[in-house]
Amino acid sequence: MKRSQLGFTLIEIIFVIFIIGMAVSVISIAVGGNAAADMTRKEAEEFMLQASYISEQSVLKGETQGLFVELRPAQDIDAEEQWCYQWRRVRDRQWQDLPELSPHCLPEGLVIEFVVDDELWEFDPELEYQDPVMGFFPSGDGSGKVEVSIYTDQLKGGQTSVTEELELDLAGELHWLSEEKRIEEDKRGR
């Protein structure tokens, strides 16, 4: 007399779980995001939020406010140099740190670059006093045309470089050019 099989064998269950696991891993690799692109976009968003806040505060408080940028040296042997920026305001004829915004450093491997009035701005560590890279005035105007690029350092990451571009125009308006382009492409794609 033969017994009828009422369930699955252990081998069959293990095989099905293996197939499902393989399918999930293939899908996650195919759909998985670009970490460098996500990090670059997050930093551009942070910069945009801070600059918009500073622009508004400059008008509301009647203060001139500026952006100071520096390349900080590596802190230990395994670390890399880091780009950091800090917003300051003019009080008593000198630049003072803003208490509401602490200095912000980009993650290692990211670079921030400025083109001020069509000239590439370069950080000079030898200077005792650095001028602000860009600023906002109480009138609502900006300090001039400034193009800001945040991107991955291709030499260190071995990854595809993703650049986020922002621009401050003469009227003090800040535009996230990369985001505007993405939105326009999404509209055309529909």
Q: Where would I find each of the regions flagged by the language model?
A:
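N-terminal helix-rich module
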Residues: 14, 26-49, 53-56, 60, ...
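N-terminal single-pass transmembrane signal-anchor helix
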Residues: 1-31
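Short, hydrophobic-rich beta-strand element in sensory/regulatory alpha-beta domains
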Residues: 64-69
